A protein has these predicted regions:
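Face-selective signature of the C-terminal outer-membrane beta-barrel domain
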Residues: 380-559, 581-593, 638-641, 646-650, ...
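Gram-negative outer-membrane beta-barrel transporters
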Residues: 532, 635-641, 652-654, 672-783, ...
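N-terminal periplasmic "start-of-domain" segments of outer-membrane beta-barrel proteins
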Residues: 23, 41-54, 59-95, 124
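Conserved C-terminal beta-signal and adjacent last beta-strands/turns
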Residues: 8-9, 296, 304-308, 375, ...
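Short strand-turn segments of transmembrane beta-barrel domains in outer membranes
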Residues: 171-176, 185-222, 235-249
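Short acidic/polar hinge/loop motifs at secondary-structure boundaries
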Residues: 143-171
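Membrane-embedded beta-barrel scaffold of Gram-negative outer-membrane proteins
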Residues: 392, 402-408, 583, 589-595, ...
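Extracytoplasmic beta-strand/coil segments of soluble accessory domains associated
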Residues: 101-143
Length: 868
């Protein structure tokens, strides 16, 4: 029932005091210099090269263990996929209420969008043109993508960013993982780890368009059950309110998270302290692995989720209406009138009454919302429960091992409500209703304005098992996962407004359908470390990753339009992957990767497929070749710095039977797709950082160092995204027969050939500033390459400022502010289209777009009270 959103890519060099430089499909750091510490305890602008000989299991937290098993392999020596990792504090500095996709805008080849226009509500990301169904999302290793639609709906998990310990994103086929697996990008999320001290925190943000965010969170003092056993408890409660930029696009979101964790350690790791480094261990490539001599056991229960009520804004703005905001001249008015005349005056017309007409012609062209009914809302709640177990131990042969298991359950229920104008009862299998016209006359009512609700109720139950073994220079992970999904779709007519007492109408169910899906997968990952060269100055490794996945998906019943359907999809996929990484003389890194990925069709591919075609599963062969150079020392304004780098990545993604977006959407806003025989994406990605100025200084009686700096950061992607033979069927409404047209070398929809970002990132003592400018090339809305059905190139800029003051008592106060779309650029970042013929070969097209807000602001305060 949810509208598809998109989310993908690699976390870029954003945040106040931490960046991890890495190469796609490698896992190497960039500097042997000891890191300076920032005021928030993060590693500031410095990382180190891993020692490939270090293969001990060093993941101490449950969250790190689960992310490591399915997303990274070994965190400090994983040859299979290296990504840039964004840690908690940089996330928090940008977390003023906007959805998670907008925390990732600086990423290479990434596009973000918002239906409401201000980043709250339904939001999404695309990477390399890939949509949400290609992005595998996991939270502590648990699959989050909806099993049927394959998308991820962040609005169902309000303010999840306030509970994140890390985000790690990669592009391409990635690694074996649970759930549907990556088909374009991978996002592995780790939640916050156990707090070593008690605290409570209040976050309050306000901003444009009535935005108000309140977050309360805290942790208890660790409860010592014995010298070896500890109990941890933490919780969060959040509320986000917004009116949206688009008319009536309100959001009322409530989210929560709570956890209780048990930890038993019989001995400290040798040579290390026992501070809770949490998920930071994954991004700080600077510590020797911990060697465990005794057992460590952790058990944790995590619950999170929320409730969302959002007014629908997924219809978009007709392009003729949007153009009126640019220049309301007679030509644009005539175009809008023609659009209106094409879509009114017949059964099922878009514009059904005087309210629709007045709304179309009189509303603000930039903020137009098709929906006017006061309760045209999406009302949904989703609840997740996870139970984790990890056990680290040393075998008799002194091999490091880890067992990990996760049980999980996701429950969701809700509906969206719709007002329908003059609908015939026959559409709902409602017999005519006899009612009194006056005291002597009765009439037979067969049509009326009415209110309906379309429901989704679903459950997902699953288990993940992992066994990790470290033997010398070899590293093994064995994984097994299984889950079962149960979905119920049904619709109800709740009110018939022509009745004297509409609410007296007994709720009538007019359709019901089920969808059940099972997913079983098993994988093995093997890494082998290498040391090469006369002086052993070339290090690296090779890896192989193999997965077998079995999917069974069945659906049957009646759809919203009373069509009966019954589909079955049984798939068996083998997904092998392999690669290498080499590091020479500290400053040169090269890596290569090739992987195969498969993806089954989603529910809507079966139920909404054009012309009744049976969708086929997709296959992708992904190749990546990456070079990373970290310069030993380059001049800055006040000396030299070794924290500069440049990365060049070449990729090729070859598809067989890719399900590409057609540009059209169904009646709940889900993008429609169809198979194309052969297609490909290929491109070059450039990322870099240059240190303009930096200075380290000692604080707190030289107890630690902090770094002031000013960095120039940027990225650029240049790509081709092509369907060699794109066959489009245009419906001819005069004959009722579709007309096939083949477009040669057509660009894949929603896949711009150019995406770039440039920014300045600086920290001066308690102040942190980030300026980011983003450029996005033309996006075609269908697979024809017709400019009239495309989104114009656009650019925007953002400014984020943070100030943090810590008191001796341990209390801290942080001020955060964002200016979004600084220059008030007028642009649209998303849209959809469809076209048809009527007795001739001329194509009549309808294009709808989603405008983004002009200059707007968010400001916030964070009070954190903890032991000093």
């Amino acid at each position: 029932m949810k509208k598809q959103i998109v989310i993908t890519a690699i976390i870029a060099l954003v945040g106040s005091s931490i960046h991890a430089v890495s190469a796609q499909q490698t896992n190497v750091g960039v500097n042997s210099k000891a890191p300076a510490k920032s005021s928030n305890g993060d590693v500031a602008q410095s990382t180190t090269v891993n020692d490939p000989a270090d293969t001990a299991i060093d993941v101490e937290t449950i969250e790190a263990a689960m992310v490591s098993a399915v997303g990274l392999g070994k965190p400090r020596n994983n040859m299979s996929s290296v990504m840039i990792i964004q840690k908690k504090d940089p996330i928090g500095q940008q977390n003023l209420g906007r959805d998670i996709p907008f925390l990732t805008q600086s990423l290479t080849n990434v596009i973000t969008t918002s239906d409401a226009g201000n980043g709250i509500g339904y939001s999404g990301i695309r990477v390399r043109g890939s949509d949400a169904t290609r992005t595998n999302i996991t939270i502590n290793g648990v699959p989050i993508n909806d099993a049927e639609s394959q998308g991820t709906f962040w609005v169902n998990m309000p303010d999840l960013s306030s509970s994140i310990g890390s985000l790690s994103l990669t592009k391409g086929a990635g690694l074996s993982t649970h759930g549907a697996g990556a088909f374009g990008a991978t996002l592995a999320i780790g939640t916050e780890t156990n707090s070593p001290e008690p605290y409570y925190q209040i976050d309050q943000s306000v901003g444009s368009y009535g935005t108000l965010k309140t977050t309360l969170k805290g942790a208890s003092k660790p409860i010592k059950l014995s010298n070896k056993e500890t109990l941890y408890i933490n919780a969060r409660l959040s509320e986000i309110l917004s009116n949206g930029f688009v008319d009536r696009a309100t959001s009322n979101l409530v989210g929560y998270q709570t956890s209780i964790a048990y930890e038993k350690k019989s001995q400290k790791p040798q040579g290390q302290n026992t501070n809770q480094a949490g998920m930071e261990q994954l991004s700080e490539y600077i510590k020797r692995p911990k060697k465990y001599n005794t057992n460590t056991t952790q058990i944790k229960f995590l619950a999170f989720g929320g409730r969302e009520t959002t007014y629908q804004s997924w219809w978009g703005v007709p392009i003729e209406k949007y153009n009126m905001g640019l220049n309301p001249d007679s030509n644009h008015l005539a175009a809008l009138q023609n659009h209106y005349l094409r879509n009114t005056g017949f059964s099922g017309a878009t514009y059904r009454n005087s309210i629709d007409s007045a709304n179309l012609f009189n509303s603000n062209p930039n903020k137009y919302n098709y929906y006017t009914y006061k309760n045209e809302v999406d009302n949904y709640q989703q609840h997740h429960q996870h139970l984790y177990l990890t056990h680290n131990y040393t075998s008799k042969k002194n091999n490091q091992k880890q067992l990990a298991a996760t049980l999980y359950h996701t429950f969701g229920t809700g509906y969206f409500e719709q007002f329908r104008y003059g609908d015939a009862f026959s559409k709902y299998n409602i017999p005519p209703i006899r009612m009194a016209a006056d005291s002597n006359i009765t009439v037979l009512l067969s049509a009326s304005d009415l209110v309906r609700r379309r429901w989704l109720r679903n459950n997902l139950i699953g288990v993940n098992l992992h066994h990790t073994i470290s033997v010398g220079k070899d590293w093994w992970i064995f994984g097994l996962g299984a889950n079962q999904y149960y979905g119920n779709h049904f619709g109800q007519v709740t009110q018939i407004l022509a009745l004297p007492n509409p609410s007296s109408f007994k709720t009538h169910e007019y359709y019901r359908a089920i969808g059940n899906k099972s997913d079983v997968n098993a994988f093995v990952k093997y890494n082998h470390s290498l040391t090469l060269g006369r002086n052993n100055n070339t290090r690296g490794g090779v890896y192989i990753d193999m997965q077998l996945r079995k999917v069974n998906h069945v659906g049957s019943g009646t759809d919203n339009d009373l069509r009966n359907f019954d589909f079955k999809g049984n798939f068996l996929f083998f997904n092998p992957k392999a690669g290498f990484q080499l590091q020479h003389a500290t400053h040169h890194h090269i890596s290569g990767y090739v992987g195969v990925a498969h993806r089954e069709p989603a529910r809507s591919d079966f139920t909404d497929n054009p012309n009744g075609a049976v969708p086929r599963p997709e296959r992708m062969i992904n190749g990546e070749l990456s070079y990373l150079s970290t310069f030993p020392a380059l001049p800055t304004l006040n000396g030299k710095s070794s924290d500069n780098h440049i990365r060049i990545n070449a990729y090729y993604m070859h598809y067989k039977d890719q399900l590409v977006l057609t540009g059209a959407v169904n009646d709940v806003g889900t993008p429609l797709r169809k198979n194309v025989d052969v297609s490909y994406r290929r491109g070059l990605e450039f990322e870099g950082q240059y240190v303009l100025w930096q200075k380290d200084y000692a604080v707190a009686n030289h107890s630690h160092f902090e770094r002031n700096y000013l960095h120039l950061i940027g990225n650029l992607s240049v790509s081709q995204n092509i369907i060699p033979n794109s066959k489009v069927a245009w419906q001819d409404y005069a004959t009722g027969i579709p007309v096939d047209t083949v477009y040669k070398n057509a660009p894949i929809a929603y896949s711009p050939n150019r995406v770039a970002a440039l920014g300045l990132q600086g920290q001066i003592k308690k102040w942190n500033v980030l300026w980011l400018s983003k450029w996005v090339g033309r996006q075609f809305l269908d697979n024809t390459g017709d400019v009239s059905r495309s989104l114009n190139p656009y650019k925007f800029s953002e400014l984020t400022v943070n100030y943090t003051h810590k008191f001796r008592s341990g209390t801290s106060l942080a001020f955060k502010a964002q200016c979004i779309n600084v220059f008030s650029a007028r642009y649209v970042s998303n849209g959809y289209t469809w076209g048809y013929m009527y007795g001739s070969r001329d194509i009549t097209q309808e294009v709808f777009v989603f405008p983004q807000a002009p200059r707007n602001f968010l400001v916030g305060l964070t009070w954190r009270f903890s032991k000093g």
